[in-house]
A protein has these predicted regions:
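Tubulin/FtsZ superfamily GTPase core signature
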Residues: 1-212
Length: 212
């Protein structure tokens, strides 16, 4: 369908995007083909792009949508590996539902989307805030396929997409400022948590941020 659209109008609108942008999409949506074309135009315009890709439950999709989703996801991952994007973040709707806990039909997508948006927002805040201390390293050029998740010092991490091979893990610890000032051995607790995730194949870094 997108091939019949007025591409000149699309190109004109995309020309207003400068420097960088983040694109959110799902391969099962009817607009995914148009989005792929838009990404090509943005790349030609020299725009740096991050992609957030929502993976649906393909088992319940129609055959047509299943094939479309797999094709779009494969194209995006190849684009990411080739450097067309800065990175692609994979997010599973099923994982979001599991983390959200109790959901209802009427508010289902709002409830699972809230899990993602609140987490993504805080990550953006932390990335643009100077940490109290950090061990952040420059990410490898090859690490372009990513995901995010939630974690705590007491529990296992809850990832938004299953990762078969973790090359780099980055923790952003948002901790109450008063707790940072008063809790004894907290830095050691954080360091031990990080060290427990390090392997020969996985490098781990972290930053600590005060919250109210």
């Amino acid at each position: 369908e997108y091939e019949t659209m007025d591409m000149k109008k699309l190109e004109k609108w995309l020309s207003t995007v400068e420097k960088s942008c983040t694109v959110f999409l799902c391969g099962a949506s009817n607009s995914s083909g148009l989005t792929l074309r838009a990404l090509q135009i943005l790349h030609q315009n020299g725009v740096k792009m991050d992609i957030v890709y929502f993976v649906p439950e393909v088992e319940v999709l129609s055959e047509e949508k299943t094939l479309n989703e797999r094709a779009v996801r494969g194209v995006l991952q190849n684009y990411a590996r080739s450097g067309l994007f800065e990175k692609i973040c994979l997010v599973s709707n099923l994982r979001l539902e599991e983390i959200a806990g109790s959901t209802n039909v009427f508010d289902y997508y709002s409830q699972i989307n809230r899990v993602f948006t609140s987490s993504y927002y805080m990550m953006d805040v932390f990335k643009n805030t100077k940490p109290i201390t950090s061990t952040f390293k420059r990410p490898k050029e090859s690490c372009r396929i990513t995901t995010i998740g939630l974690g705590s010092l007491e529990k296992d991490d809850l990832m938004f997409f299953p990762c078969n091979q973790e090359v780099e893990v980055v923790y952003y610890y948002g901790i109450n400022e008063e707790k940072l000032k008063t809790e004894e051995n907290l830095f050691r607790t954080i360091t031990n948590k990080v060290k427990s995730r390090i392997t020969d194949e996985t490098k781990v870094s972290f930053g600590i941020y005060p919250t109210q």
